[in-house]
């Protein structure tokens, strides 16, 4: 059967896709990921027909998103807010990304959180996280982070925080519970 992305978005459904290169191979993971992203983008763009105040928010979470970046992904980032799409991206470091995508992220993303990073990324992010310096980023202790929030359309002053330490609960034991 096929996936109806319009239905998923309209009914706030969750789609989980495991694109593990180890399970399906690198080429298959990238191809499937790109197909899903293009279908999702087409469904998101159709929301232009819905009055803005009637668009319910929809959220896209992409881990290791550097594997799925295209030029159209940059345009999705720049237009996501007006279509009611919240985008949550994670990756390891900026060097994995084309320059156009880096610019799209820094120009359009409201909230950025960073844990300890290398000097090259610290050079980039310290400009976004004043008063924190590149040395502050490279010397963060385990579980500590810097964050810059978007609140009511305005960027907050960057601040530091400490995340909870992971507990020893196995996620695989909670899978059924999470899916419910």
Identify the role of each PLM range.
Residues 1-85, 101, 139, 145-155:
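P-loop NTPase motor domains
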Residues 14, 31, 134-180:
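Conserved P-loop NTPase motor module
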Residues 17, 115, 161:
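Hydrophobic residues at beta-strand termini and immediately following loops
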Residues 32-40, 125, 129, 165, ...:
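Short amphipathic C-terminal alpha-helix that caps PH/PH-like domains
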Residues 64, 116, 163-165:
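Conserved residues at beta->alpha junctions
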Residues 76-158:
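Conserved ATP-driven motor cores of ASCE-family P-loop NTPases powering translocation/secretion/packaging/pilus
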